[in-house]
């Protein structure tokens, strides 16, 4: 015992809590000998990629419709905790590799990616707390000073809303701002103006899972027209000051080799042409999941067609997985990767995937999930990794705004050293 440092793990406790959709998720605390405590909560997705790490649910229909996470909680408290006690919280990789080895599967299906990630993030927070430094500095070192451009999801469709809009997210991107605080204000003003624009047209202003409006619209183009109108009415220049971004989530409407939108099926090449036309007609700077997660051939074609003009982000395509990203790099499919901690299930693997992308000219977009909590880790992660971009929903719902407010505090803390990524943080490298 004499060799145990005060940053050694003394206790780990997990519990079942609720996410922003009222569904169970897991929270973990990591306690160190020094008295430092790290707390982390794990999000959950609605439109999940086939190749994501396994989220363990109880499947006991008598509790939460089978969506409980007591098995994951048990796995933390009874299996992971005993093996992690006395490990140094500052050795993040050892902690994560130990948990991955204990799970023993390729996709964390035995213990659950949600169980492993909760401990992984809580350990990092405990480590930062023990050193008396913020999480972004703990993970990113002295160069962690780049505030990300927010891609703000203000119109929801697809799997994130109960409406007839095909694409999942229509986002505003304040590329022309000079600070994160200014970017956030611009976004909030456009969001408020969009509410007025929708109301004036007799459209619904109820919001979806991520806080964006979810009206029934005639087409995807109508959504884009509404955003341009709101940007202009708020007093900003579309493209120059506030640009647009899309999460197509094409895997959600891919049927038997065709893309079914606007009420009928379309061939992949026809759909690629359609996306190209949208880029021509609107100030779009980023398209996420423009094609199905296994349609590698047409991802190459899409990248050849518009990849020099816009950012093409793989979410379901890459699922924060270094192996799948390596394939994308080799096949020249896309030019950016969406980073979701719970897709891969540990902090170490997440950082490795970001590093692989950076070394190969792929930008990273740090992202929330549709089922979120008040946990703000992704805000710190975006600054720590100098990713330059973050997706954390709309300008309402406190589980979304919590991340924006955390970034405001980080910007204040950095003072004159803070740099806002702006337009340079987006697009193909």
Curated annotation (Swiss-Prot):
Pathway: Carbohydrate degradation; glycolysis; pyruvate from D-glyceraldehyde 3-phosphate: step 4/5. It is an enzyme of class 4 (lyase). GO terms for biological process: glycolytic process. SUPFAM superfamilies: Enolase C-terminal domain-like, Enolase N-terminal domain-like. One of its GO terms (cellular component) is extracellular region. Keywords: Cytoplasm, Glycolysis, Lyase, Magnesium, Metal-binding, Secreted. Its cofactor is Mg(2+). It catalyses: (2R)-2-phosphoglycerate = phosphoenolpyruvate + H2O. Pfam families: Enolase_C, Enolase_N. NCBIfam families: eno. This is Enolase. The gene is eno.
């Amino acid at each position: 015992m004499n060799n145990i440092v005060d940053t050694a793990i003394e206790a780990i406790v997990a519990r079942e809590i609720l996410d922003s959709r009222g569904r169970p998720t897991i929270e973990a605390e990591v306690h160190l000998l020094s008295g430092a405590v790290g707390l982390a909560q794990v999000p959950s997705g609605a439109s999940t990629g086939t190749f994501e790490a396994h989220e363990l649910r109880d499947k006991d229909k008598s509790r939460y419709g089978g969506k409980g996470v007591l098995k994951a909680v048990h796995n933390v408290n009874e299996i992971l905790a005993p093996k992690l006690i006395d490990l140094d919280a500052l050795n993040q990789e050892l902690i994560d590799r130990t948990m991955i080895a204990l799970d023993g599967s390729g996709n964390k299906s035995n213990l659950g990616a949600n169980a492993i990630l909760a401990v992984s993030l809580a350990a990092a927070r405990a480590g930062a707390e023990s050193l008396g430094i913020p999480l972004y500095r703990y993970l990113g070192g002295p160069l962690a000073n780049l505030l990300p451009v927010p891609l703000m999801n203000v119109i929801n469709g697809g799997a994130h809303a109960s409406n007839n809009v095909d694409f999942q997210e229509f986002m505003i991107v304040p590329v022309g701002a000079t600070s994160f605080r200014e970017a956030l204000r611009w976004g909030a003003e456009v969001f408020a103006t969009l509410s007025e624009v929708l109301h004036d047209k007799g459209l619904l202003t109820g919001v979806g899972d991520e806080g964006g409006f979810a009206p029934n619209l005639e087409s995807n183009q109508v959504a884009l027209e509404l955003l341009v109108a709101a940007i202009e009415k708020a007093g900003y220049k579309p493209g120059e000051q506030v640009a647009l971004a899309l999460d197509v989530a094409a895997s959600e409407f891919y049927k038997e080799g065709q893309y079914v939108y606007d009420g009928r099926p379309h061939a992949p090449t026809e759909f690629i042409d359609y996306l190209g036309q949208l880029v021509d007609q609107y100030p779009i700077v980023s398209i996420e999941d423009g094609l199905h997660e296994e349609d590698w051939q047409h991802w190459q074609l899409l990248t050849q067609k518009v990849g020099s003009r816009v950012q093409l982000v793989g979410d379901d395509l890459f699922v924060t997985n270094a192996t799948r990203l390596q394939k994308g790099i080799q096949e020249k499919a896309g030019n950016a990767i969406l980073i979701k901690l719970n897709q891969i299930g540990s902090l170490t693997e997440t950082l490795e995937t970001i590093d692989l992308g950076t070394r190969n000219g792929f930008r990273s977009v740090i992202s929330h999930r549709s089922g979120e909590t008040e946990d703000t880790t992704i805000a710190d992660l975006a600054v720590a990794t100098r990713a330059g971009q973050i997706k954390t929903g709309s300008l309402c719902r406190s589980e979304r705004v919590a991340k924006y407010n955390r970034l405001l505090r980080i910007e204040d803390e950095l003072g004159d050293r803070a740099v806002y990524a702006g337009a340079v943080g987006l697009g193909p490298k």
